[in-house]
Regions:
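Core SAM-dependent methyltransferase catalytic element
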Residues: 223-226, 232-250
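Hydrophobic beta-strand segment of the Class I
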Residues: 33, 133-134
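Conserved alpha-helix/loop element of class I SAM-dependent methyltransferases that forms part
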Residues: 32-35, 42-61, 77
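C-terminal alpha-helical "lid/dimerization" subdomain adjacent to the S-adenosyl-L-methionine
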Residues: 165-223, 229
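A short glycine-rich, Lys/Arg-flanked "PGG" loop and its adjoining helix->strand segment in the class I
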Residues: 146-161
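Class I SAM-dependent methyltransferase SAM/SAH-binding core
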Residues: 63-122
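N-terminal, positively charged/glycine-rich alpha-helical extensions of SAM-dependent methyltransferases
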Residues: 1-32, 182
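A short acidic, Gly/Pro-enriched loop at the edge of an enzyme's catalytic core
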Residues: 121-132
Length: 250
């Protein structure tokens, strides 16, 4: 496995068609990523992930694909809730993967979770391969979002589910103005201050640019997914989208 700080992944850890360096921004903030997540979310991010994994309604001995797995928080949550599952995590950031692999080893899940350098837009897996597919706080950063959604629809079993967690600027609700102020002002400033990196300004901009929940659910439909639930969380700062492959999917 690649050690933290290596320039390139071992060939055995790279999926075909993955462009090296596409996770460069996250390479720069990887060392403080988990800490910043806890601080900026006030610790609520753990609950968001628990809800996403529960929404998969996985069968025994499930096979799960976690896209943009990062430091493996979702992969490990799957195994906390379903110890008999097998999880494959893909991410384009070497540094995030290295931290995730250390966490997997510490949790004693080396045989149940495998983390690979890979691209959500081009999955080298057969149709209907996974009981569940997840992506947490990652679809916003995928260049070709429609292609990634179509790939999720393709590799999910007909009876399986897809769970997508994403950050966005709150648009509705009594506390929406306060939540928007937090996202626009405090998130980038606190993130940059604590990390010493400007990437958390990108976080605010990308949240503002992400489609409203209804619009994103429609994008899922166009990509071959049938939305089952759209659930705003924490005053709409996060939304959980749950879907299954559409009836017309191959």
């Amino acid at each position: 496995m690649s050690a933290l700080g290596e320039d390139r992944p071992h060939p055995d850890e790279v999926l075909p068609g993955t462009a090296f360096g596409s996770g460069a921004m996250f390479d720069r903030i990887a060392a403080r990523y988990d800490t910043l997540n806890r601080i900026l979310s006030l610790g609520v991010d753990r609950r968001w992930r628990r809800l996403a994994v529960r929404a998969l309604a996985l069968p025994p001995a499930a096979r799960v694909l976690d896209l943009v797995t990062g430091t493996a928080d979702v992969a490990l949550e799957v195994l906390r809730q379903h110890p008999d599952a097998r999880v494959l995590g893909l991410d384009p950031s070497l540094q995030m993967l290295a931290i995730g692999r250390r966490k997997v080893r510490r949790a004693g899940h080396e045989r149940s979770a495998e983390l690979l350098f890979g691209d959500a837009q081009d999955l080298p897996y057969a149709d209907r391969s996974f009981d569940g597919v997840t992506i947490a706080f990652g679809i916003r950063n995928v260049p070709d979002r429609a292609r990634a959604l179509a790939e999720m629809a393709r590799v999910t079993k007909r009876e399986g589910r897809v769970a997508i967690l994403e950050l966005m600027e709150p648009r509705e609700g009594f506390l929406a103005p306060l939540a928007r102020s937090f996202v626009r002002s405090l998130v980038p400033r606190v993130g940059a201050l604590l990390s010493g990196a400007p990437e958390y300004r990108y976080l605010q901009r990308s949240m503002a640019a992400f489609p409203a929940p209804d619009a994103f659910a429609e994008a899922m439909r166009r990509a071959g997914l049938e939305p089952l639930e759209t659930r705003p969380l924490t005053q709409g700062v996060v939304c959980l989208f749950v879907a299954r492959p559409g009836r017309g999917a191959a």
